[in-house]
Amino acid sequence: MTKDIMDAVFIKEMAKTTSNLYRLGWDERNGGNITYLLDEKEVVEYLDVKQIIRTIPMDFDGKKLAGKYFLVTGSGKYFKNVEEAPAVNLGVIQVSEDGKAVHLLWGYTDGGLPTSELPAHFMSHIARLSVDPENRVVMHCHATHLLAMTFTHELTEREFTRTLWQMCTECLVVFPEGVGIIPWLVPGTNEIGEATSEKMKENRLIVWPHHGIYGAGKSMDETFGLIETAEKAAEVYTIVMSQGGIKQAITDEQLKALGERFGVEAKAGYLNN
């Protein structure tokens, strides 16, 4: 006999995280989406994986994820409602063996579908797993100050990253590889998924100009914390600029010393010699 899935740690983590994202104002209305890669042993405690509720086709090749299980936020669903109604707003899915569809095993009880950004998420999972087999989470949100920076700051990866590093001491330690930036592209398309996943091979944070940010990590906390740290730096930058601009900042020499102390190395070429 399986356990009640409402007691599952992964459901509780997802509900807590989506509530926090909404509370912070980063996922207004139905903005934002999360995919959480689950181990089969986690899933079978709560679900009979042979009981498929329905099969949902995909318009891209997900064969590299064949057989894998994911907890996914629903298309058009509001993050503010997840905690009260997980079964309506979330779904547990398994990628079909041919990679052309997903099998719904639980959730979306009102007939809903996985997030429209599923191609970008799955492509990002494939990219991250190729360089980090422990990656489990891909998270997209509209972090306010990072989004604002894409209108006012130079959109080159090096300069954008350097500004974030200089705003908060912890930034270099948390994301020494910097942030990736893609061009503005139509959301929900394979094109934006391909652009994002290409950047995910080297970065865990990808900025979507005038839209939001993608983050990836080994756990829900790590991924949330990654975005949270970059967003804090962007908020500090916004305040600094409103106060008249930068008069002094963390120097490159100090960033190098910081990296040495915490055992991280800034992305090659991002610090001046």
Curated annotation (Swiss-Prot):
Pfam families: Aldolase_II
Catalytic activity: L-rhamnulose 1-phosphate = (S)-lactaldehyde + dihydroxyacetone phosphate
Predominant localisation class: cytoplasm
Keywords: Cytoplasm, Lyase, Metal-binding, Rhamnose metabolism, Zinc
SUPFAM superfamilies noted in UniProt: AraD/HMP-PK domain-like
GO biological process: pentose catabolic process; rhamnose catabolic process
Active site, per annotation: E117
Keyword check for Acetylation: no
GO molecular function: metal ion binding; rhamnulose-1-phosphate aldolase activity
Compartments where located: Cytoplasm
Associated pathway: Carbohydrate degradation; L-rhamnose degradation; glycerone phosphate from L-rhamnose: step 3/3
Cofactor: binding details: Binds 1 zinc ion per subunit.
Presence of the UniProt keyword Zinc in the record: yes
Required co-factors: Zn(2+)
Function: Catalyzes the reversible cleavage of L-rhamnulose-1-phosphate to dihydroxyacetone phosphate (DHAP) and L-lactaldehyde.
Family: Belongs to the aldolase class II family. RhaD subfamily.
Designated name of the protein: Rhamnulose-1-phosphate aldolase
